[in-house]
Amino acid sequence: MRKLFVFLLFLILLYSCNNINSSQGGSSSRSTISGAGATFPYPYYNIIFRDFMQANAGYTVNYGAIGSGGGIRSLRDHSVDFGASDAFLNQKEIESMNAEVIHIATCMGGIVMAYTLEGIDSLRLTGELISDIYLGKIDKWNDRKIAAINPNIDLPDLEITPVYRSDGSGTTFNFSEYLSIVSKEWNDNMGIGKSLKWPAGIAAKGNPGVAGIVQQTEGSLGYIGSEYALTLRLPTAKLKNRAGNYVDATLETISAAANVELPNDMRATITDSDGPNAYPLSLFTWILVY
């Protein structure tokens, strides 16, 4: 699968680079391919781009993990050959581009709720509780609503420190989309977006920034790509899905969420899928090219 993706990536990026050079009157060959965007798939892209360069010695891929919003702006400004985003372009963004943009779904993954609580390595949360925490309505770990779904855990009388993204983020877009689905109050007051005005918590840049703050801060809670939690060995909460089951973000539960038919333009969401084993905070991520 990885070899196939590397080959497809070569064709996609070479086509993109040749189109850009042709439109600018340049050479049709190019040794450096530049991209920028989402931090969520960055660990995966690191491996893929490494394999791509090993298989194609004449090419170098430079990728800046600056967030989905930055990747979209960079593609619009023609400062990169490809952008990367965890949120597909909306109609306004499509209309702002200089040419037709192709969405290539490269991988799927899960956004996890990582936390740091000494002595607690198992926790359950619901979308409604996460919404209340980030709205500032629940501010203690031993709040009765959290305790009610974690009856066998001795939750501390400790303030919750929610951590969120400071940059334009596709991870934030998917996180806020999920909360807008499960919480009317969130939908009415916060809505969906790559960048939001947060009422409580600590801001950090990129998935690595949020993961780092969570790792260093007792009582913290943050939304990050599952690979970042795995790398830092951060515990993550089981989330209640639409079917009422508490599930972890695993290959099986994310795949269950992705059991959907993709439209022709590849723009699809798998947030809060209704499968009994589906992980509710699952997503596709895309490479964007002209």
Regions found by a protein language model. Name each.
Residues 1-4:
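Positively charged n-region of N-terminal signal peptides that target proteins for export
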Residues 6-16:
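Bacterial N-terminal signal peptides
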Residues 17-290:
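Flexible loop/hinge segments at secondary-structure junctions
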